[in-house]
Amino acid sequence: IKENMSIMEKLEILSDAAKYDVSCSSSGVECNNNGSGIGNSKACGICHSFSADGRCISLLKILLTNECIYNCRYCINRASNDVVRATFTPEEVCDLTIQFYKRNYIEGLFLSSGIIYSPDETMKRLLKTVILLRSKYSFGGYIHMKAIPGASEELIKIAGYYVDRMSVNLELPTNAALKKLAPAKTRDNILKPMRMIQNGIHSDVQRLKSSSVNVNRLSGEHTVNAYDDIFDTALSSDVYRMNNSDNSFFNHYNSLYSVAGKFSDTDNNSITGYSNKRSFVPAGQSSQMIVGATDETDYHLVTIAESLYRQYDLKRVFYSAFVNVNMDESMPLQIDGKGVPLLREHRLYQADWLMRFYGFKASELLSEDKPNFNSLLDPKC
């Protein structure tokens, strides 16, 4: 336990703790030039992702906290691990994001978290952060935020209007694997927020059509100049009406963040004001699966990804080759580079591309008789 940490000490801990979430493509790389050129790469939280038009964008990638009530066997932040714990306040995340943005280090924020106290408490802290960013700091950059399985639907609904993308990690391919490695998590709890987000996006598309607002949902880019009036002080008169048992949370917002809108507990869960000015999760949702922690085949993995695309309208499924950070002898070990090969992860991404962009079915790429890709061959072969 380390007390009175500086914000930079927290950044070092919480950016490193976020590096195993591959929903953004790269992070944790530090490289200093030798004096013969210009430019240094810092490892603290800067990762690179790609927009729908192919641009590479830099994101501040951090956890709100690495404290966690769960004890997932594959996770470095599990409750039983003796690691230094740190927690950002919402204001600290906002300050870091704005300072990095002003210096042109980043174009947006990727915000995830360990589960502190409960899913609802964690989701509330994440929500406080993005409301502050959008309202108090008038931040118009890209925000990707995790939706926490087990959190209330109302919190996820509100968050969807403040962020560009949300993601819910599937974690492991099967319910049996979850029971074995993450017994506190269930498939139903993970799929429920995915369905909430999907339904919210569909409902919002209909709302936007009825109000004749032209939003290009495929790219997540607003073809009307929607950002011009999102964050003005008129938001203080907006009203978000919804049911939630934790009235103190919303009363807290009424007093501290009135610029972002007021919350009350009446009128059939309708959300007005901010939602009329911005679409719901405009860049869509994504998910992530760990590859190789259990014995699922590539065929099983691409079949699950195909189902997520078709049944939940996901924009991306990410694959993360398992790294045995806890050196658990009952799980695949990485010793001298052996273990789950990164090339397997790469082949899954290539197959995923064929499904997303060229309409291939999982059954056209693999079968139960031939369930795995040849790591030496591109799936197109």
Which residue stretches match the model-derived regions?
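Flexible, acidic/Gly-rich N-terminal and inter-domain linker regions that tether
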Residues: 1-67
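Conserved alpha/beta core segments of nucleic-acid transaction machinery
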Residues: 366-381
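Conserved AdoMet/S-adenosylmethionine-binding subsite of the radical SAM
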Residues: 117-354, 358
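Canonical Radical SAM [4Fe-4S] cluster-binding loop centered on the CxxxCxxC motif
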Residues: 62-91
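Short acidic, glycine/Ser/Thr-rich loop/turn "cap" segments at secondary-structure junctions
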Residues: 77-83, 110-119, 143, 178
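Hydrophobic residues within beta-strands of alpha/beta enzymes
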Residues: 75, 108-111, 166-168, 317
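Short Fe-S-cluster ligation motifs
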Residues: 96-112, 351
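Short, charged beta->alpha transition segments
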Residues: 60-63, 91-102, 273
